[in-house]
């Protein structure tokens, strides 16, 4: 099972996104085995989708909520609880700045649920401690 990073959700949702086609190719191949979202990815999807600089046009909240609902109503979708922050996880040792906190937490959420995080952010996989790179799949 795969937890979709917000960059994958944005690319899937909005056809003007630069990664729209690779996101759909990945999703078409992998969604039958299931995919997940969590509160962190869902709220980030809402926030970023309402930013015209991110999606290329001005959208209203009703449009964005409808798109989010299309993900959550998909037959292969699961909602994963974020849970309490695991401050003892070894993945935190490689965090060097504020922009890596949410990424690391998403990896830990995926790990806790027995899955992996799927993203377009190749640097995320490289930052993980040795032996944990399998927790992230990068769409290329």
For every predicted segment, state its role:
Residues 7-8, 40, 122-123:
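Alpha-helix/helix-capping structural signal
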Residues 15, 39-43, 65-95:
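Acidic catalytic patch
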Residues 37-39, 101, 119:
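Short beta-strand scaffold positions
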Residues 1, 84-96, 104-140:
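Acidic, PIN/NYN-like endoribonuclease modules and their adjacent C-terminal/linker elements
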Residues 1-37, 49, 53-63, 129:
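Short, well-structured N-terminal submotif of metal-dependent ribonuclease cores
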Residues 34, 76-78, 134-137:
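Conserved beta-strand segments of alpha/beta enzyme cores
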């Amino acid at each position: 099972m795969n937890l979709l990073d917000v960059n994958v959700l944005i690319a899937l949702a909005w056809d003007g996104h630069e990664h729209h086609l690779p996101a759909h190719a990945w999703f078409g191949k992998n969604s039958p085995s299931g995919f997940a979202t969590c509160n962190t990815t869902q709220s980030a999807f809402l926030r970023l989708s309402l930013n015209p600089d991110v999606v290329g046009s001005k959208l209203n909240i009703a449009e964005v909520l409808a798109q989010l609902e299309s993900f959550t109503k998909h037959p292969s979708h699961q909602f994963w609880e974020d849970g309490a922050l695991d401050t003892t996880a070894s993945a935190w040792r490689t965090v060097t700045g504020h922009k890596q906190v949410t990424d690391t937490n998403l990896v830990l959420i995926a790990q806790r649920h027995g899955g992996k995080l799927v993203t377009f952010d190749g640097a995320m996989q490289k930052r993980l401690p040795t032996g944990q790179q399998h927790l992230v799949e990068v769409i290329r």
